[in-house]
Amino acid sequence: MALRLYDTLTKEKRAFAPIDPSNVRMYVCGPTVYDFAHIGNARPVIVFDVLFRLLRHLYGENHVTYVRNITDVDDKINDRAARDYPGLPLNEAIRKVTEQTERQFHDDVDALGCLRPTVEPRATEHIGEMRTIIDRLVAGGFAYVAADHVLFSPAAMNAANSVLPRYGALANRSLDEMIAGARVDVAPYKRDATDFVLWKPSKPGEPSWPSPAGITMEGRPGWHIECSAMSWKHLGETFDIHGGGIDLVFPHHENEVAQSCCAFQTDRMAQTWMHNGFLQVEGEKMSKSLGNFITIRELLATEKFGGDSWVGEILRFAMIKTHYRSPIDWTVKALDEGHKVLWDWYRDIGDVGPAQQLPGEFIDCLADDLNISSAIAFMHSLRKDKKFAELLATMNFLGFSNAESVLARRPVGVRINLPPAHAEAAVGTVEVLAKPLSKSEIEERIDARTAARARKDFKESDRIRDELAAMGIAIKDGKDADGKPVTTWEIAR
């Protein structure tokens, strides 16, 4: 099957035809390096890693250029640096924060089994390209200078009689709708509420560079111009695929399109726009205010979730088993289920080597808009048919190769009984809980769950149920002889 990908701009699945098959070019928005990456950040990293692998398979390992940027200039970085290193000059503190956070990010995504991108540019290394694009936009009448800022005018873009796309096309919004929905407290130097910043003056002590457009005061770039500059430098004026999370469609990606197309007078910045769906935690949007903000590092290195640290491959599996455009509800139960699948696969494979050729049906699944969930269903059939060499080849292709670590962490409710090839990796051969609880401790949790159910606090009830499940305790709700609700429990087998 030829590769077909869903394009956010056209809202349809289309045959993928690279501009230059000898150099397929993809850009994905990367992290702003001011704090540990959270599990929502992990999803696009993993999704586009699988796409990178597929493109390399289809077009050749040396014929794909994957660019994922590092944003190392941002207000959040400045705030973090000032808070963490109050005794240092701000620029030095910023350097410490960005270098440390970038290392942490790389450690985390390496643990998730992701390949490094071909190029990983930093925003601060591309200030010259940003100034060049801004000067072009001002000269073309698409941007203007006001109060030492440079601002882009979507109205000017839409008024241009040229090949340019309509501002708002990617997000499927009209300019009138955006103006009506703009906040009341619009900066006084803006001509229109929808105008956005390309460049702004720096405050004393902040990072600063010589400004474009004849501005004498030094300043720093806005967020959106950074990606336009880095993609242009490494991929050209127009390239094949631009990816990121669905939350970036507007305003970030919409503004990237505006900047790049107006600067280079093209009708498209990228031939295909791809966006992965939202991630929720236990049914709610993840946020620090709700107390459900989970970092990749917490899952990999602490026992906060499920009573033990998690292997990166397990998180990877939980992220890809759902189609990339669908939302994900992250739960400890989902990690347990993914762990059980990988554990079963690795256990059955034993010391079998991978097949030399990937099954065609497996590649066909992935070529259908990166349908990894369908590919996983096919992998289950390989296990059922005892085609373990083919199963291992498909696992390796999707980034799963750490059998020892996966097998060393026993899934909830599973007896350890491994073939000799992996016996040394196992933690034991007895049926015990991952984190043993006393009978009274279990019953205390069940009583707390019963009380939560009585007051209709089902979120808390489900949380306790999932916590017990993660510890190997299966609970069952029923009624006693008098018809009253009762909950029983047993150690899962």
From Swiss-Prot:
Keywords: Aminoacyl-tRNA synthetase, ATP-binding, Cytoplasm, Ligase, Metal-binding, Nucleotide-binding, Protein biosynthesis, Zinc
Motif ('KMSKS' region): 285-289
Motif 'HIGH' region, chain ranges: 31-41
Molecular functions (GO terms): ATP binding; cysteine-tRNA ligase activity; zinc ion binding
Binding positions for Zn(2+) per the UniProt entry: 29, 227, 252, 256
Family statement drawn from the similarity comment of this UniProt entry: Belongs to the class-I aminoacyl-tRNA synthetase family.
Protein name: Cysteine--tRNA ligase
Organism for this UniProt entry: Rhodopseudomonas palustris (strain HaA2)
Gene this protein is translated from: cysS
